[in-house]
Amino acid sequence: MANSILLFSFVLVLPFVCSVQFNISRFGSDVSEIAYQGDARANGAVELTNIDYTCRAGWATYGKQVPLWNPGTSKPSDFSTRFSFRIDTRNVGYGNYGHGFAFFLAPARIQLPPNSAGGFLGLFNGTNNQSSAFPLVYVEFDTFTNPEWDPLDVKSHVGINNNSLVSSNYTSWNATSHNQDIGRVLIFYDSARRNLSVSWTYDLTSDPLENSSLSYIIDLSKVLPSEVTIGFSATSGGVTEGNRLLSWEFSSSLELIDIKKSQNDKKGMIIGISVSGFVLLTFFITSLIVFLKRKQQKKKAEETENLTSINEDLERGAGPRKFTYKDLASAANNFADDRKLGEGGFGAVYRGYLNSLDMMVAIKKFAGGSKQGKREFVTEVKIISSLRHRNLVQLIGWCHEKDEFLMIYEFMPNGSLDAHLFGKKPHLAWHVRCKITLGLASALLYLHEEWEQCVVHRDIKASNVMLDSNFNAKLGDFGLARLMDHELGPQTTGLAGTFGYMAPEYISTGRASKESDVYSFGVVTLEIVTGRKSVDRRQGRVEPVTNLVEKMWDLYGKGEVITAIDEKLRIGGFDEKQAECLMIVGLWCAHPDVNTRPSIKQAIQVLNLEAPVPHLPTKMPVATYHVSSSNTTSVSSGGATVTFSSAQHGR
């Protein structure tokens, strides 16, 4: 019983100390983070409006205020939110339905306005009419045309609205054709580009002729307060409609500021006073733990079967060999701290010496119990075990015993590229930087065009470029890589990678491609020449005070691109014409418009002086992206795996 009380207390405290990141796949009575107003109710999903009644409004909001921008620097936060929904338009047979729902950001502690049903979407009313009484930005899925403020050229629409019922940007959308289908939405705010984008798709009824993305340039730090409430609002008017929120995921790059909603306080009082209620809740939690544990055991058994199959395939192959955990622990002195080369999100890398091979190796040890780590282990072993190229880190062996997952690579005595560019290791001479750039490009050419399948790496960055004893570049870390057919276009993989290196269309659509890898290569090339990071990381927060691509493009427009050369190179000397060529190729590869980016082969031709240096626009273009789900084949699913650019070695 004491353990149950401790567990229950931990469950109560946990939401108030975590960062701004949550993932709710089911809305039940045990989900305390969500506050409901108006007609909104939770019964597994959130019923924002009841289809059996007219003139209704409902809110479901996150119960803590979310920091949107830093008051000290006025720099906004990147954020992304994913959610799934279902709209019931069954009453279309009676003439119409309405009015839709919206995801909104508004000041903290606001309440559902009175008399805000119908076309007001629960955000406005007759007194404030088309302008909100409080700062407000929202994305609306509007199913009913109100001629006073809605666009007249479409029946229903998806819009991005800035403090007004009139959409700042919109596109047509037909809710009838998607009746009862599950819609899945991604909303992303790129604070560096001030770009708020939304894209959506449907499980069964996606239409290739229908627009499915939208974006709007807005500086949220100029519109909204530093701390906001986020949530959903839906209404019905004289006609009815069912709006259900099925799941919700949110992630932000600023830390959470804790506030306690009054209704949470009341719940705490009730729990504290009612012993019987506490016992019931304890019983419920215990039952839930037992249920989840059994479910986890079943899933683990399936994973074990899958891993066993993979182990057998690897053991039959002629590639990397299998090692015992005992041998690897001995090689790395039981994985002592003084053997640690670097640490990332899913484990650490250690230096070791294998007596059986008489050689130094790097041992990547995945964190125990990490599901993502297991997936990365499987992905990396399956892909890299078949690859052979002088500019790829060579996989020597692997180990899977119980819950331990390890990979053994050739040892890179000169460490990672980022340690030389941004860390304390000796700086790199100009001819070495040129060799590294061409080596990385050669590795990418092999992955994209020369191997039997196209490999999209998805996490090309300076910390994943290793340097051997002769400072040859070796691309590593294939845990996020995906295999694709050469003839297919961008594939839906889910957002993964590192902010600062991810292409804008990849952030907006979640579709990885050879072009998104080329963008990352362009950013790394600019880092190599300038010695500057793609984004700055200060006090644990990502603050793109100077976005490298934007700054370099500005200098290019002024004809001053060469002034950005790494100051360390001015001591040992460099080829100015060659440096300018590398910078322009870097910008070309990091072009915001995916259709204007070169292939890696074209970039290599310019770097080798086999083709002329391209002429780029003097001002950095702003591209928008159309998301169509009809022409792609999904190769992966699941949540986002995103890290932030830093000076750490590896992921």
UniProtKB/Swiss-Prot annotation:
GO function terms (MF aspect): ATP binding; carbohydrate binding; protein serine kinase activity; protein serine/threonine kinase activity
Highest taxon of the lineage: Eukaryota
Active site: 459 (proton acceptor)
Pfam families linked to this entry: Lectin_legB, Pkinase
Region Legume-lectin like, residue ranges: 20-251
Segments on the Extracellular face: 20-269
Residue ranges of the region described as Disordered: 630-651
Sequence intervals crossing the membrane: 270-290
EC numbers for this chain: 2.7.11.1
Membrane topology according to the record: Single-pass type I membrane protein
Enzyme class, spelled out: transferase
Biological processes per GO annotation: defense response to oomycetes; plant-type hypersensitive response
Binding site for ATP: 341-349, 364
Cellular localization per UniProt: Cell membrane
Segment forming the signal sequence: 1-19
Impact after mutating residue 459 to N: In LecRK-IX.1-RN; loss of kinase activity and impaired ability to mediate resistance to Phytophthora
Gene ablation phenotype (knockout): Increased susceptibility to the oomycetes Phytophthora brassicae and Phytophthora capsici associated with reduced expression of some defense genes (e.g. PR1, PDF1.2, CYP71B15 and CYP81F2). However, normal defense responses to the fungal pathogen Alternaria brassicicola and to the bacterial pathogen Pseudomonas syringae. Susceptibility to P.brassicae and P.capsici is enhanced in plants impaired in LECRK91 and LECRK92.
Principal subcellular localisation of the protein: membrane
Leftover remarks: Both lectin domain and kinase activity are required for resistance to oomycetes, but only the lectin domain is required to trigger cell death.
Assembly with partners or alone: Interacts with ABCG40.
Biological role: Promotes hydrogen peroxide H(2)O(2) production and cell death.
Family designation: In the C-terminal section; belongs to the protein kinase superfamily. Ser/Thr protein kinase family. In the N-terminal section; belongs to the leguminous lectin family.
UniProt xrefs under PANTHER family: PTHR27007
Protein name: L-type lectin-domain containing receptor kinase IX.1
